[in-house]
Amino acid sequence: MTSHAADTAICYNCPPEWADWGTQLKAIAKDTGIQVPQDNKNSGQALAQMVAEKGNPVADVVYYGVSFGIQADSAGVITGYQPAHWDEIPAGMKDPDGKWVALHSGTMGFMVNVDALGGAPVPQSWDDLLKPEYKGMIGYLDPASAFVGYVAAVAVNQAKGGNMQDFTPAINWFKKLQANQPIVPKQTAYARLISGEIPILLDYDFNAYRAKYKDHANVAFVIPKEGTVTVPYVISLVKNAPHPANGKKVIDYVLSDKGQAIWANAFLRPVRPSAMSADAKKFFLPDSDYARAQTVDYQQMADAQKAFSAKYLSEIR
């Protein structure tokens, strides 16, 4: 093993602009000596690459939306690891064998660049987004590839009376939305929202709070009045990883007091409730707004994803 390999861990889908992985990767290097290069894959791209590399894995750890963690387990590309603070992680937020463990969660809603609305009101509901005054203003990540896009689809589907066995309400909503000529990027579109190119983005609370409080943009976050969903993002140890000991240290770190505080300071709800300080909590919308955000059966959500993607690809684009 070269000296370089000894102090490296490869993470798939650790983009510095997303969820403040930039700060987290620097802290990992400073406190553990392990260098983790940034990586801009989305959840779907990360899983596809791991499956392609199954015979000769390159990554040590992978970060992705929970439904991709469940799929990665089915694909046999991750292995169990029960990290430090295991007992503090709620049952629904981890695989019983530690194949995937939640780090933090986000709530889906509308991230709105108020200055880019051209005088239109801030939309408050899924139905509002169908109004012609928002033509050319709405963006969402590709629901057939990016986890955040699929979460948006699940959220509108639940809000419109659908369930994991029936995505007709979501498909109908996306069909109607096409009249407003939405913009559909494949990867994180944060900068395009800040610049005003995409005035309204279907995205998580933590990105909107970051825009508002860190980048001082005139950004509002809206939890739509018909309801929405909250989902965890999870981390896994890759099966037959080239640097498994370093991979385990990285997982331990992002679940440690220090690692969890970094997520909370980036406006993410840390999986360990004790890590959310009163100072961090005051940046969030009130609990009365979050009452409209539900958790879902993430196994069912994972099971439904392929069929939804196929339906979306055939009927929407």
Where would I find each of the regions flagged by the language model?
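Short, low-complexity disordered leader/linker segments with a strong preference
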Residues: 1-10, 317
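Early extracytoplasmic/lumenal segment of secretory-pathway proteins
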Residues: 6-70
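Extracytoplasmic ligand-binding site segments that recognize negatively charged/polar headgroups
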Residues: 14-22, 58-197
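A ligand-binding cleft/hinge motif common to bilobed small-molecule-binding domains
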Residues: 66-73, 194, 199-218
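Periplasmic-binding protein-like
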Residues: 88-91, 106, 171-176, 182, ...
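A bilobed periplasmic-binding-protein/Venus flytrap-type ligand-binding module shared by bacterial periplasmic
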Residues: 109-116, 154-159, 231-244, 254, ...
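Mature extracytoplasmic/periplasmic domains
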Residues: 238-296
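Conserved C-terminal helix/tail region of periplasmic/extracytoplasmic solute-binding proteins
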Residues: 292-317
